Amino acid sequence: MKDLVKFLKAQSKTSEDFDVIKIGLASPDMIRSWSFGEVKKPETINYRTFKPERDGLFCARIFGPVKDYECLCGKYKRLKHRGVICEKCGVEVTQTKVRRERMGHIELASPVAHIWFLKSLPSRIGLLLDMPLRDIERVLYFEMYIVTEPGMTDLERGQLLTEEQYLDAEDRWQDEFEAKMGAEAIQDLLKGMDLEAECEKLREELQETNSETKRKKITKRLKLLEAFVQSGNKPEWMVMTVLPVLPPDLRPLVPLDGGRFATSDLNDLYRRVINRNNRLKRLLDLIAPDIIVRNEKRMLQESVDALLDNGRRGRAITGSNRRPLKSLADMIKGKQGRFRQNLLGKRVDYSGRSVITVGPYLHLHQCGLPKKMALELFRPFIYAKLESRGYATTIKAAKKMVEREDAIVWDILAEVIREHPILLNRAPTLHRLGIQAFEPILIEGKAIQLHPLVCAAFNADFDGDQMAVHVPLTLEAQLEARALMMSTNNVLSPANGDPIIVPSQDVVLGLYYMTREKVNGKGEGMLLQDPREAEKAYRTGEAELHSRVKVRITEYVKNEAGEFDAKTTLTDTTIGRAILWMIAPKGMPYSLFNQTLGKKAISKLINEAYRRLGLKEAVMFADQIMYTGFAYAARSGSSVGIDDMEIPAKKYEIISAAEEEVAEIQEQFQSGLVTAGERYNKVIDIWAAANERVAKAMMENLSQEEVINREGNPEKQASFNSIFMMADSGARGSAAQIRQLAGMRGLMARPDGSIIETPITANFREGLNVLQYFISTHGARKGLADTALKTANSGYLTRRLVDVAQDLVIVEDDCGTHEGLVMTPLIEGGDEKVPLRELVLGRVAAEDILKPGTEEVLIPRNTLLDEKLCDVLDANSVDSVKVRSVVTCDTDFGVCAKCYGRDLARGHLINQGEAVGVIAAQSIGEPGTQLTMRTFHIGGAASAAAKESSVQVKNTGTVHLMNAKFVTNDESKLVLTSRNTELTITDAFGRTKEHYKVPYGAVLSKGDGQEVTAGETIANWDPHTMPVVSEVSGFVKFVDIIDGLTVTRQTDELTGLSSIVVQDVGERATAGKDLRPTIKLVDANGNDIFLPETDVLAQYFLPGKAIVSLDDGAAVKVGEPLARIPQESVGTKDITGGLPRVADLFEARKPKEPAILAEISGIVSFGKETKGKRRLLITPAEGETYEEMIPKWRQLNVFEGEMVQRGDVISDGAETPHDILRLRGVRAVTEYIVNEVQDVYRLQGVKINDKHIEVIVRQMLRKAVITKAYDSEFLEGEQVEVARVKIVNRQREAEGKPPVEFERELLGITKASLATESFISAASFQETTRVLTEAAVAGKRDELRGLKENVIVGRLIPAGTGFAYHQNRHKHRLVDDVVAKLSEEDEAAIADEFVMTADDASANLAEMLNMADDAE
């Protein structure tokens, strides 16, 4: 028995115990060593006997027996002959499963180039030989000769010769040289390469060359050569002489009835290769004419190509039904390939699916499971119980009992199911809450019952949705399901940390109705001794639910010792609120209940319960809330009738007023006062405003009603109109929807997004006429089409995000960095968009937080900022905090818990082993379907409103100007002469309240540090033109301003004033091309004036289109405009919004017209212009001048002689994240991407924590480009993982060498996924062929660090509960190394202590769970 166990262990050991997977090129000897024999014939199986043919593709002698322990001829049967080889048929007697693992081979009569290394770009063979792919193909497909041995001739090695040239050369030199064609020639060339020498040569070339392109080319080739040297691959192995044959059971041939066969396409492809190979062998034996042999060799090459990757070269080989045959490459790539179909997504046994329906009486941790399903799913457990109880003697008997459905079976089912959690899953599973565990309750009927509160997490509704059930079988799985996946453990959303178990719809309506107030309700003013009495009064009809009464309320407050102190007060409240208080858990304040509860308030209730009282209380409270809500929703009798939609009386007059305005615009248009575009924009504006007014009138009408109070006076109260209540409570519907019911439908959009200018003035209550209905359908159909596209796009975005972030796991507690991001509240204009509290909650402080204006430490560094500490920050009005971030985390291959902060779904510091990458990807991807696909067209009307021209302050406070330069004009106002000036208003505590961007040339009435009062306008500017501001006072002197050459004079017809307009260089006559129109300022004597405190002349170069309204010699004062440059009013600008915008940001795509940023700090000047471009020069204080060519049509934001800082915007446009990273660093680019992504999500009202976006940004930044390599293993210009460089630099520092210099690089998520260290992960994502080719040539090793690789090789993932398992495996490896050195006896003793199995892993899990509980 012991031996048998040992034997079984030995069999299973081989596949389990590895830590690295290496991929490489197979040498011919290696292929032969795998093989169990050569396949010589193309036959498959005998069609009469169905036995495999000998030496054929299914040969039993090569691949193993067809039946278990039985040879082909039947001489040896049974287990006792195990391992015998039959002398008659040559088959080894063993299990038939060896037919899945034994390979064969084909000896090719002529070498064949492997198509992957030839055609997968860049071509590896081409790169190695330094030849173009076209030439190599000509040689391979027998069109040209190539010289392999030049000998003493003047031919060169690798030179191509045509047929004629070859014959000439043969005549001249006879046998001096050697030239061949076909794969043999390429093989000879590859064999003859001396890789080391070639590397040396390239290194020297790299030192000498200066041209960038050459360097790139050499580096590429050098990298490939070095990879070959290091990996031990030989270049000639890229040309195959032996072809491996896949085991037959992996390319099955199945006989169908009727004598036909269903076969895998691979068999056809192999047959083709064998046929051609055998024919070629025969031709070579016969010494056939060259041309025939060549043709056969070419056909062999083509058939091998088709087998490996059909359709990569030439037309794909098709089968009988004219569809291309599925080659080996097709087997592994794509959604149906091996990776995605079989390794990453498997079907699961013990599962079922059914329709879901509501289970309003369930507890949160329960679900209703139909008896029929349960019986089927829990079969093995029932069999075991029946046998152990003695009801059945054998499994067969038990099976019969279950099939007969005996009465006893149901009792046992109930017993088995007790406390055995099951998993429910609703597709699509967009985030981890899409699979949760519940305890099953057996029910009659055939639908699964689901608890209403988890619907939000599953995104489920009961209109026919289906859900799948899975049964966790092992004890470990049940434990995990209960401890980690139970619905009661998933109260908070991992995306933002808010409760996800929030009542909606009926429950909200019930609670809202219950907590409303009513003026002069029955029983108003009663005094009641406690909520029980209030309920009694309500039940007996003494008082209405909404009546205002006084009730004695007893609250419980936690004291220092953690016990509850009772506190009773007489409170003004309503009957309903008092009744609701009866379900409140101890420790909640009554103030939260004493209000009209809408959806937001209820969410806050549950959140408070969770934070104050912990998980268990919060869950029980949520359940009670739900039961109460349902009960009172039923009592309320809310329903919708057509009379509830009250149309405001004002509607008709608003509409007729709008129609008059439109008619007026139309007249103006016809008399030519406004353009067609302006007319269209104005009309749309008028209707939009009218619609708003109707909506407002309607809401005023609906939301209030007048009643008579107890004193007999009229009083307004919130209306009890059903439609209003539903919208107001947040149960269903919104003001916009009510507007369509009772106001007017308003403007509709065409499918292309533009707006139809005739609005629908009717609403749904009045009904639409045919035209109005038709207009409605127009835009509505587009909405439906969009939704379908959106779902696919959103899913693809999620897939890319998961792929890029999948290997990011919390691996240590603290990396010890002092770096971090500085968080400040997000303020746009005069209002705070996101308060500081939201940004830092759940983060860890990177530095001590000081009390503003003192040195007193409020919060020490490395403290997790929770709700209480955030209150401290608010109380002390701290307005910027430096917090740790994953982007600045120093951990290699992972992140640390401190840099991540709070686990949002649990509320404490995150545990080690948590897969934060996947959580981040799910949190960003899941709301993707809610984002729009729209591209927003902003027309003239909307953009006119967007162009501000002044700053009006909303708060009283102090003005602060950032990077501002200005001059003071004679009215002692400031005129800005700097570009990106920011103006902020701070309050008495120094907190920033408002934030504005102010353009060049703006006139400020208050300076830096001055006080302002609310409502004051402190800055003005002209939005349509940019002035050129004089910085000194003096007299104007025109230089190169020559009428007709460089400028033209224009006279305004209305005012009669004339002005000078500078011409664009392109429009000028030849004589004026090199002139530079300039305004110079001189003093009264005509001497040059210099700018204050500099030696720069006060002269202003005028760009094209500039308008000068001064005359030569005019006097100007400081701060006066010398000229104006019209800002082209940009027409309709498309703003990419929604999902495409998020995808663009994460893909780090460059926008069409990116902003141009200054590469260095210095003084701007302009050099010689070329045909379409201007030359911009920036001269720094010391060092090289930087120059850049800029297209003329780009509007520049700088004048000649102006000082710019590195990273300043020179020409407006969308900023490129790559530029931001290069010029302003990692923090700036993180901030940019986080803010831009958040803008899109905020617009849709989706809340996502910044952390998740930062996680993705970290993954986008994981590569670096080496700028100075010194004597390290890296090449300059090579792309390497940042972690690798850091590790090397640490070693170099220890050795006292200079560190390798590098620049961080930003990769889009697709690129980053493909550039990951793990080739398995990259291959299973996209471009499988390219990834595998690259990896094989380089002999890459996959350390199996990420989650995906481990799933693919079938291991526990190194995250969550598998984290401990992997750490232990690591420990054992170290122990094994020690053990190997010890003697045999000691080994046995130690091995007993260190055996880690999956069972141990589960023990570890239990340990971890206990730790987690303690932490909570």
From Swiss-Prot:
Gene3D superfamilies (UniProt xref): 1.10.132.30, 1.10.150.390, 1.10.1790.20, 1.10.40.90, 2.40.40.20, 2.40.50.100, RNA polymerase II, clamp domain, RNA polymerase Rpb1, domain 3
Alphabetical UniProt keywords: DNA-directed RNA polymerase, Magnesium, Metal-binding, Nucleotidyltransferase, Transcription, Transferase, Zinc
Reaction(s) this enzyme catalyzes, per UniProt: RNA(n) + a ribonucleoside 5'-triphosphate = RNA(n+1) + diphosphate
Residues reported in the UniProt entry to bind Zn(2+) 2: 815, 889, 896, 899
Binding site for Mg(2+): 461, 463, 465
Enzyme class: transferase
Classification via NCBIfam families: rpoC_TIGR
Protein name per its UniProtKB record: DNA-directed RNA polymerase subunit beta'
Protein species of origin: Haemophilus influenzae (strain PittGG)
